[in-house]
Amino acid sequence: MRVKQKLRLIPRLDIKGDYLIKGVNLEGLRKIGSPESFAKKYYSEGADELLIMDCVASLYDRQNIYSIINKISKEVFVPITVGGGIRNIEHANNLFKNGADKIAVNTAVTKNPKLISELALKFGSQSIVLSIEAKKNGENYWEAYTNTGRDHTGLNIIDWAKKGIDLGVGEILLTSIDNEGTRKGFDIELIESFSKFLKNQNISIPLIVSGGMGKLEDLNDLYNIEFIDTIAI
């Protein structure tokens, strides 16, 4: 059993265009402000990492995230992970040049898994995060979705995670579509199932879980689950 030192909390900023947004189940997205101002606020409050996700880049092939990351990286001096619409080496390189420390990939790599290996070879596995948007579609079965929870992939999240790890990802971001934005607590069944997979396969990889936190007491439900390193809120 791996000994848990502490759970890290990192702010998750979901972006649409030039705005920070929030929604429920990754739907019904509403604007709540400027990503730059919120990033600076979280940094001033002691955040030691930021997760920034462009929620429409994969749908519309938008790449305005570069300028947003560039501005944030000049004001916020902690590691920044960026996801959304990363289709190739060029997109990834532009994010790194504009201040990203890690990138989170999802839609493009479900269609072209070899891209994971190409990114890991070019930038290092430690900088590649596999973003898995999980939705329950049967008893003890979760499917990986893409395009902010809109599109089926037909991929079992366990099989997909194992393939991603084999191809070279250095970290996993596991988001519960069913619980995201609901503030009703974490999807414990999903997280425990994923933790069991890591344990059974003897896989040691940083795991970020996201979706559902509504109060600090919700963290108590996670503390005794192995392999969780970080909570994105």
Map each language-model feature to its residues:
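Hydrophobic faces of well-ordered beta-strands that scaffold small-molecule active sites
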Residues: 9-13, 22, 50-52, 80-84, ...
